[in-house]
């Protein structure tokens, strides 16, 4: 199953996340199919960028979004 979720990058105590499309069996930071955005929780205001066109495409072909990505996509 294909899922849209966050992958953590950045360094210790300085998280930065990519919004990626990946197979549900992969590890959190394992290989991904496509990166469609990012989320920076440390900036003020929190910086969220998601490519809506690609998000809608992947939802259309059956990808499920994680709860956090659903909340972030409403803010973007």
UniProtKB/Swiss-Prot annotation:
PROSITE patterns: RIBOSOMAL_S16. Keywords: Ribonucleoprotein, Ribosomal protein. The keyword Ribonucleoprotein applies. GO terms for molecular function: structural constituent of ribosome. One of its GO terms (biological process) is translation. It comes from the Bacteria. SUPFAM superfamilies: Ribosomal protein S16. GO terms for cellular component: cytoplasm; small ribosomal subunit. Belongs to the bacterial ribosomal protein bS16 family. This is Small ribosomal subunit protein bS16. It comes from Helicobacter pylori (strain J99 / ATCC 700824) (Campylobacter pylori J99).
């Amino acid at each position: 199953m294909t899922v849209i979720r966050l992958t953590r990058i950045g360094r210790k105590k300085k998280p930065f996340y990519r919004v990626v499309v990946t197979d549900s069996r992969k590890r959190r930071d394992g290989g991904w199919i496509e990166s469609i955005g990012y989320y920076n929780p440390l900036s003020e205001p929190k910086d969220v960028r998601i490519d809506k066109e690609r998000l809608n495409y992947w939802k259309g072909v059956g990808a499920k979004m994680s709860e956090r990505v659903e909340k972030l996509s409403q803010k973007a």
